[in-house]
């Protein structure tokens, strides 16, 4: 049983990408709007989209967004285990904000009993002083092959004594089968943790699903806590993970085309969301087998969890030749974090931090070299752009030190120190600062340099408005009796 007196509820899904993250964010904002002290919590997240929490250390960007929705400072305790994939079957493990180690799938399973203690400790800290904690599961509790030692779904819920609401995605089809199938496959103790379910992403006349609700209740005995429509405001929230990225074909059909090569281990690609939100920008995600568009004015190389292997893939795709042609045509390039490292002459990894390749040539567009180092830089930062004399607010999460002649032309001054590099002609820029496009003045300066002089929206305000809209939709479409019990 939970020692804390804070109320808690856990949203688990019938599968991945059913909308748990957005629902948790919406419920956090709804509770905060009613004056409650509410906090989000996710025992285990797998994502290369990380944030720097307000108390230092890494958490998933989704939990950072949920803390924003809750109007509460973010904390490493809100996402005690973060897995950052860096190979096909291996991940870096972040525990309570700090690097714990690396492990492949089977090795990680053996670590779970140890990690459960950290998860429960973090949950107690998050719950202390809160009125309500809203917990997000990962994947699906129906993955019974992973039930032993589970810390992400029912393993956590049963140990912490937190009731579960199951979320099903009707948009992808088969929602009745997924809910009833989950009921059928769960062990009795896990099944007893489920208080009810929510249908998410519904389109059309809700009354057409009345028979579906009755059928689900007949098979499972679970009540329906609401049928939530497709939440349009969710499109204005930062993208969470690569599942979402697969659907982000482009932004608007605007005058400025910006191309973004999608690397296998792309990280922190929500850096691009503010650009995607601009109506006069067309943001094109270039996937495997595609060419970097010849008519792109700007190419952005995003962050990477594994710079050296992603650089090899970049070349294998022929994107290095595309990029050289782009530069010869007068095009511009921005590299962020791992993308910045790729733009240099050489990447050295003498300690083999990223694997077996000890050094590899870069793309040669900046006169810099990077050496990987074991100590990771993790911090929120205030900066100023040297290009547009614009304030920047962002964060740094990176391994490695970059030096070279082009660093004498820094792209930003971060916390009083130089960061990044500019080519002599100013057309190639690199930086370690994530979040720079979310700084409205910088984004305005960048777009103005391409001849786009329209008024720029306040990106943070747009996210806040989206959260309020989602909270309002949940208040309208969730069972008022269930909400009353949850929110007091």
Swiss-Prot record:
Family to which the UniProt record says this protein belongs: Belongs to the CobB/CobQ family. CobQ subfamily.
* GO MF annotation: an example: catalytic activity
The UniProt function text for this chain reads: Catalyzes amidations at positions B, D, E, and G on adenosylcobyrinic A,C-diamide. NH(2) groups are provided by glutamine, and one molecule of ATP is hydrogenolyzed for each amidation.
Q: What is this protein called?
A: Cobyric acid synthase
Q: Kindly give the InterPro entries that the UniProt entry links to this protein.
A: Class_I_gatase-like, CobQ/CobB/MinD/ParA_Nub-bd_dom, CobQ_GATase1, CobQ_N, CobQ_synth, GATase_3, P-loop_NTPase
Q: Which GO terms describe its biological process?
A: cobalamin biosynthetic process
Keywords annotated in UniProt: Cobalamin biosynthesis, Glutamine amidotransferase
Q: Which Gene3D superfamilies match?
A: 3.40.50.880, P-loop containing nucleotide triphosphate hydrolases (3.40.50.300)
Per the Swiss-Prot or TrEMBL record, the active site comprises 337 (nucleophile), 434
To which pathway does this protein belong?
Answer: Cofactor biosynthesis; adenosylcobalamin biosynthesis
The record's section on Pfam families has: CbiA, GATase_3
GATase cobBQ-type domain residues: 255-442
Identify the coding gene. cobQ
- Please state the span of the N-terminal signal peptide per the UniProt entry: none
